[in-house]
């Protein structure tokens, strides 16, 4: 499908890698392996958009009866430009509440360090971690597919796609913070 779109002139200007890794719960093993053995040199990696748990809502938002949100973590830590691209994609299209509650270096949950984007960030690759927050089934066998909110995951995935699409079609790569 992607090759057909590219052949018809609708492809991105830059390459995209869709990377599925495992071993997160055992110490981010898959992403640690990848950054040591990347398909392309990490210096050529513009950004890492990490989607880790985006199909549900957390207890906080459930109690407020708010569904159209996503936690955004780390977007401006290495590149303010990346954060602005994400905000613009959201304001222009998806209009989710971007919740930065966990985007504080002193957050006791330390979510910034607990998902696969972290190995990229440690290697100076700008990241965004998209997360729906913890819920009662977090890291339990009871976290089953029937509990996914498919219209919501679609909207959140659209935000990730639109951010990625802007990144791969810009005339210049995003700049790192000084």
Name each region found by the language model:
Residues 1-8, 37, 88-96, 123, ...:
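Structured segments of extracytoplasmic/periplasmic soluble domains
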Residues 1-27, 160:
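Alpha-helical metal-binding/catalytic segments enriched in His/Glu/Asp
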Residues 3, 131-178:
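His/Asp/Glu-rich mid-to-C-terminal helical/loop segments that flank catalytic regions of hydrolases
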Residues 7, 109, 149:
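Generic anion/oxyanion-binding catalytic loop in active/binding sites
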Residues 7-11, 96-104, 171-177:
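Surface-exposed patches in mature extracellular/periplasmic domains of secreted proteins
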Residues 12, 41, 126, 173-174:
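Proline-rich low-complexity regions
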Residues 16, 67-71, 141, 145:
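Glycine- and acidic
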Residues 22-129:
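Metal-dependent peptidase/peptidase-like ectodomains
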């Amino acid at each position: 499908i992607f090759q057909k779109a590219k052949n018809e002139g609708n492809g991105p200007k830059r390459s995209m890698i869709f990377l599925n890794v495992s071993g997160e719960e055992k110490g981010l093993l898959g992403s640690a392996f990848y950054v040591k053995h990347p398909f392309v040199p990490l210096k050529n990696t513009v950004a890492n958009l990490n989607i880790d748990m985006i199909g549900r809502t957390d207890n906080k938002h459930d109690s407020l009866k708010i569904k159209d949100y996503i936690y955004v973590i780390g977007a401006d830590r290495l590149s303010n430009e990346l954060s602005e691209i994400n905000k613009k994609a959201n304001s222009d299209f998806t209009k989710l509440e971007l919740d930065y509650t966990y985007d504080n270096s002193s957050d006791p949950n330390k979510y910034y360090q607990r998902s696969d984007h972290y190995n990229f960030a440690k290697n100076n690759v700008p990241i965004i971690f998209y997360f729906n927050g913890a819920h009662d089934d977090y890291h339990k066998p009871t976290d089953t597919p029937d509990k996914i909110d498919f219209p919501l995951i679609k909207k959140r995935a659209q935000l990730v796609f639109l951010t990625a699409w802007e990144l791969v079609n810009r005339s210049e790569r995003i700049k790192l913070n000084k």
